[in-house]
Swiss-Prot record:
Protein name: Protein transport protein SEC13
Transmembrane annotation, as ranges: none
Assigned keywords, A-Z: Cytoplasmic vesicle, Endoplasmic reticulum, ER-Golgi transport, Membrane, mRNA transport, Nuclear pore complex, Nucleus, Protein transport, Repeat, Translocation, Transport, WD repeat
Cellular location(s): Cytoplasmic vesicle, COPII-coated vesicle membrane; Endoplasmic reticulum membrane; Nucleus, Nuclear pore complex
Principal cellular location given in the protein's record: membrane
Length: 302
């Protein structure tokens, strides 16, 4: 479960275990990390100081991913592990507790991602067993749907914005009838789009985007709500593809060539800058030119 740890500066912790993920919460005040030692650590962030305040234990294998829920649901953190389990943690009265644990998958759960809060309290989980599960908290109870997305394993999942291109957000920030939609990347070299059908209560594949020649390691749907949708996909084929569509049906791709395996892609909050992490320990930043095409504007080497 959860252990209260002594206050320790983040930089003073010896890197005895590989760190797999590090994510700030919505306000940037807390940092969650996870590692091969089967634990999750919570740090308070104040300026340049990171103070360890909690160590969460519950997984039986390396923890690959942590994800903060939107603060409207409270201080909620999800974690996924090689052990095939997904755990939901919540802080109450300054104490972290495990509030839900589920083992729907028969292999590693590689990533978990919360949906935009406008569509509900939903968590998508992608697994090496080829399945995606979607957990939902509603009416004080958890439920789930699980389906096969890629027979050879699902490596990544990313939700679409609650607002489709060209739509207008209401003053309250709520989007009536916001669509439940996400994209996955798999070991079958494909990028797939999925929509939820309220009529059948199931998820259906609406698009299969092909072009990569090796595993798709990561996908990221841009948060932009401009005239087009943008999806970035990172592959072991040493390319990143940027897929664009104005109607969610006809997709075009632009290929960005990189010098090593592309592991991760991440959009800026405004959706106009794409960060690409590659196997040569570099992070490159890309922007779309006004005249079209994409250019690398900065490279950061570790």
């Amino acid at each position: 479960m959860a252990d209260n740890g002594q206050n320790v500066d983040l930089l003073s912790i010896e890197a005895n275990e590989v760190q797999h993920d590090a994510v700030l919460d919505y306000y940037g005040r807390r940092l969650a990390t996870c590692s091969s030692d089967k634990t999750i650590k919570i740090f308070e962030v104040e300026g340049d100081k990171h103070t360890l305040v909690e160590t969460l234990r519950g997984h039986e294998g390396p923890v690959w991913c942590v994800a903060w829920a939107h603060p409207k649901y409270g201080n909620i953190l999800a974690s996924s592990s090689y052990d095939g389990k997904v755990i939901i943690w919540r802080e109450q009265s300054s104490t972290w507790q495990k509030i839900y644990e589920v083992a729907l998958h028969t292999a590693s759960v590689n990533i978990v991602a919360w949906a935009p809060h406008e569509v509900g309290c939903l968590l998508a989980c992608a697994s090496s067993d080829g399945n995606v599960s979607v957990l939902e908290f509603k009416d004080n109870a958890w439920s789930h749907v699980i389906f096969q997305a890629c027979g050879s394993g699902v490596n990544s999942v990313s939700w679409a914005p609650a607002v489709a291109p060209g739509q207008v957000v209401s003053a309250s920030g709520n989007q009536a009838g916001a669509a439940r939609r996400f994209v996955t990347g798999g070991s079958d070299c494909q990028v797939k789009l999925w929509d939820f059908s309220a009529e059948t209560g199931s998820w259906q594949s609406t698009q299969i985007l092909t072009g990569h020649t090796d595993w798709v390691r990561d996908v990221a749907w841009s948060p932009t709500v401009l005239s087009k949708s943008y999806i970035a996909s990172a592959s072991q084929d040493k390319t990143v593809r940027i897929w664009t569509s104005s109607d969610l049906r006809d997709w075009k791709s632009t290929v960005l060539n990189v010098d090593a395996v592309a592991w991760r892609v991440s959009w800026s909050l405004s959706g106009n800058v794409l960060a690409v992490s590659t196997g040569d320990n570099r992070v490159s930043l890309w922007k779309e030119r006004l005249s079209g095409g994409w250019e690398c504007v900065k490279t950061i080497e570790e």
